[in-house]
């Protein structure tokens, strides 16, 4: 087996190939790890934010790793879970609350190339997915799909609903119809990698339908008006 271009035309026997390769890979990994610092930029995510023109947001390794670890912990995800990832991977929702959370928790990741309601229904039924994240319009599209009753979605247990506001009556209907007791309402922004607040896992559906949750660890909130910090009970 030719491992790589070698001036001496060195070849490796099949039996020794895995050991040689793993040794080289470990050395490369150790060298790379020594070069990377937690505060270094891991990726650049684009967000339109308050304008229609996309802006690049530099997210650090520290921010992405810690945010996803906390999401996985708050959601109680484990190796027993299977995530149906239907949100795009070019967005924090897909990367942080999807791929990275699976790495932290050991959960399976089932990816969809594009979002189509019927594809989500088929994926959940086929792989018995336990977790489904999405924006309110995605959940409502599933809810109102005329063929939904033809699919077995009983495996769904939890997920995150975020990205835009959802009416209390709509949220409760989604939870009730899909049987998702632990569909957690969350608030975030790309600059925060993205989760800022999330409802408590054991909060009632009534409470979760009227709140975006509590701040996660290492997140600080401030109510501000005209550069003046306001009290918690005041508007800002």
Model region roles, listed by residue range:
Residues 222-236:
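Conserved beta-loop-beta connector loops within the AMP-binding
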Residues 7, 12-17, 23-46, 53, ...:
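Conserved pre-ATP/AMP-binding loop-to-beta segment of ANL
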Residues 65-82, 90-131, 145-146:
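Conserved AMP-binding/adenylation subdomain of ANL enzymes
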Residues 41, 47-50, 83, 89, ...:
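Conserved S/T- and glycine-rich ATP-binding loop of Class I adenylate-forming
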Residues 39-52, 57, 68, 72, ...:
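ATP phosphate-binding P-loop of adenylate-forming
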Residues 1, 55-58, 85, 107-114, ...:
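Short beta-strand->loop structural element characteristic of the AMP-binding/adenylate-forming
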């Amino acid at each position: 087996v030719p491992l790589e271009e070698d001036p001496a035309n060195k070849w490796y026997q099949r039996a020794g190939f895995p050991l040689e390769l793993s040794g080289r890979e470990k050395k490369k990994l150790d060298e790379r790890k020594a070069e990377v610092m937690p505060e270094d930029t891991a990726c650049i995510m684009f967000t339109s934010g308050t304008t229609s023109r996309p802006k690049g947001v530099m997210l650090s390794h520290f921010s992405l790793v810690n945010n996803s670890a906390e999401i996985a912990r708050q959601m109680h995800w484990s190796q027993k879970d299977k995530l149906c990832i239907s949100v795009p991977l070019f967005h924090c929702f897909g990367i942080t609350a999807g791929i990275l959370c699976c790495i932290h928790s050991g959960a399976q990741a089932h990816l969809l190339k594009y979002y189509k309601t019927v594809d989500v229904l088929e994926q959940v039924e086929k792989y018995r997915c336990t977790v489904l994240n999405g924006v309110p319009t995605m959940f409502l599209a599933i809810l109102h799909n005329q063929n939904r009753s033809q699919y077995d979605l009983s495996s769904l247990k939890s997920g995150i609903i975020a990205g835009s506001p959802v009416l209390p009556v709509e949220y409760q209907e989604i939870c009730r119809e899909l049987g998702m007791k632990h569909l957690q309402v969350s608030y975030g922004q790309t600059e925060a990698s993205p989760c800022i607040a999330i409802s408590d896992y054991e909060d009632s559906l009534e409470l979760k339908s009227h709140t975006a949750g509590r701040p996660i660890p290492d997140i600080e909130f401030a109510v501000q008006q005209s550069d003046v910090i306001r009290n918690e009970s005041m508007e800002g």
